[in-house]
Amino acid sequence: MVKMLFFAFLPLLFMTGIAAESTISSGLNSLKTKIDAKMPSGKQLFDKVVEMQKQIDAKFSNDDERAKVMGAIGSLSTAVGKFQSGDPAKIASGCLDILVGISSVLKDFAKFSPIFSILSLVVGLFSGTKAEESVGSVVKKAVQEQSDQELQEALYGVKREYAVSKAFLDGVRNETSDLSPTEVSALAANVPIYQGVRFIAMVVQRIKYIKPKTESEIKRMLTMLELFTDLCSLRDLILLDLYQLVATPGHSPNIASGIKEVSNLGREEYKKVFEDLLKNDDKETYLFLSYLYPREKNEQSRKIFNFFDLMKVKYDDRLKQDLTGVKIFSNVHWPNYFMCSSNDYLALICTKPYGSLKLDKLNDGYYSIKTTQHDPKICHRYGNYILFTHKRNDDLEKFNFVPVKLEKREIYLLSSKESPNKFAYVPQNADGALFFVDGIPSKVGYGNQGYFTLVE
C-alpha cells in the first residue's frame, strides 16, 4: 500500500520542479496534502516526505538551485516506470538514471552528497523486498564513481598548477644573471613544494586499499594510476629544477638540501606504493595485472611502466622478456602433460612435448599461438575453450601471459586481449579441451589447474 501511494504521487513530485518558479519545498508540500496520514501506510509515507523536505531545505537555500535539482529529477520521467515495474534490475536502473541526471546539474560534490541521503529515503520504501539489495548496490557504486570523479578533477587541477610552476622555473633558468638571495627565498616560498601532497596521498590510499574486481573498476584504477604518474613526474621535475637553481654556489645550501630531501622522500613513497601494487604473489591483484600487462599493450600501460623505470620501481623482470619461440606449455597441476593441437582444438592430451606450438609476439605486446606446421593454424578463444583454425579472429587470437608467483615459483596465467577477465585452466582429469573461466581459476575452485609454465 505504501508503494502504491508513493508511486501514485511520484509523477506529481517530479513535475513540481519542472517549472522554474517552483521549489522543492512547495512540491513536497503539495505531495503531503494528498497523503492520508491517518492511515498507517500513509503515515509512513508522510514521515518519509517530511524527512526528505528537511534535508533538502537544509542543504539548498537557493530557490534556483533547488529548482535545477528538481528539474533534473522531473525530466527523468522514464525512471517512474522503472520504479513501478517491481523488477529489482529496473528499479536499480531508475535510481542510477536519477543520480546521473542530478550530477549533470550539480558539480559540487559537497552539495551532491546529500542527494544520496534523499534517494536512500526513497529506497527505504522498498524495505523488505528483493529490490533493496539491488538498489543499494547501485547507490554505493554511484557514490564511488562520483568520489573518483571528484578526485580526478582535483588531480587534474594540481597537475595544471604543476605545469605552470614548471614553466615558471624554465623561465627563471633561461635568465643568465645570478639569482639574488631575495629571489632564492621567493622561489622557495612560492614554488609549490608541498602543493598536491594531499591529493597524492588520497590517490595513494585509493591505490593501496581498493582491489578492483570488475572491468569498470580496473579501468578507473588505470586512469587513476596514469594521473598519479603524471602528477608525480611533474612534481619530481619541479623539485629537481628548483634544487638545481637554489644549489648554485653562493645561494642557499640549507634550502637546497631541504628540497633534495623532499624529492628523495617522494620517490621512496612512490616506489613503495607501486611495488606493493605489483606484488605478483597476491591473488587479489591478478585480475588487475591482466589488464596492465604486457607493458607494450597500449599507450597508457607504456606510460605507467616508463614511470616505474624512472622511479626505479622493482617489478617482474619477465615483463621485459620476449616469449617469441616458446614451444612447450606445461600445467602446474599436470606437469607431465603438454598443450598440443588435436582435432582442431587445443587439449592437454600430449604426454611428451612434440614442439607443435610456438608463440609469436605481436606489435601490441600480446602473443599469437600457432602450430609449427607448413600451413600453421592459429589458436583463438571460442566461447569458453580454444580452437585451432586458419580463420582470423582478431582480438580473440591475441593472448596474454600474466607473470605471477606460486610459492616462489615463477608461473603464468593465460588470458586473451578480448576478455582479460577470463583465464584458462586444465580439466581435473587432464583430458579434453582447455577451458576458460570468469575470474582467477585458483580463486573459483580450480586450484593449480590455471597456472602454466613456459619452456623454449
Curated annotation (Swiss-Prot):
Tissues where the protein occurs: Nematocytes.
Top-level taxon: Eukaryota
Note: Negative results: the fraction containing this toxin and CfTX-2 does not cross-react with CfTX-A and CfTX-B antibodies. Found after both pressure and chemical disruption of nematocysts.
Assigned keywords, A-Z: Cardiotoxin, Disulfide bond, Ion transport, Membrane, Nematocyst, Secreted, Signal, Target cell membrane, Target membrane, Toxin, Transmembrane, Transport
Family, per entry: Belongs to the jellyfish toxin family. Type I subfamily.
Gene Ontology molecular function: toxin activity
Keyword Transmembrane helix: no
Name assigned to this protein: Toxin CfTX-1
Subcellular location: Secreted; Nematocyst; Target cell membrane
Species whose genome carries this gene: Chironex fleckeri (Australian box jellyfish)
